[in-house]
Amino acid sequence: MNLSIFSAIIFSITIASSAIPISENYVSWSSDSNCLDFDDSRDPNAVCEATTTWKRSENSSCIVSVYYVKKEKSSGTSNGIPQCSKTPCDATEKIVVDCETAFREKLANINH
């Protein structure tokens, strides 16, 4: 097969696949945290932050849910209340919702 024909076929497949909407099975899950040793820290000014992002297809739309929590030793026991959002992927502003709404059964998978 000629290299230019092969390249054209690969290019056509790439263009066609980029136009395919996100699959119902699409899932992206990421977590970032510096809270691992927070509870054991003796530093009275210790601070930790944790974020989990879940990107998926829901009712044929791309949705991204974000879980964010910040804990500060100096603020006492009432800090560290998570803030969550559930927003369409193409939106410019996050839509704040309760964490149960944003993560449903996946909320139990978040360990911060």
From Swiss-Prot:
The keyword Signal applies. It is found in: Secreted. GO terms for cellular component: extracellular region. It holds the Pfam family DUF1505. Its main location: secreted. Keywords: Glycoprotein, Secreted, Signal. Glycans are attached at N59. Residues 1-19 form the signal peptide. Belongs to the UPF0375 family. This is UPF0375 protein R05A10.4. It comes from Caenorhabditis elegans.
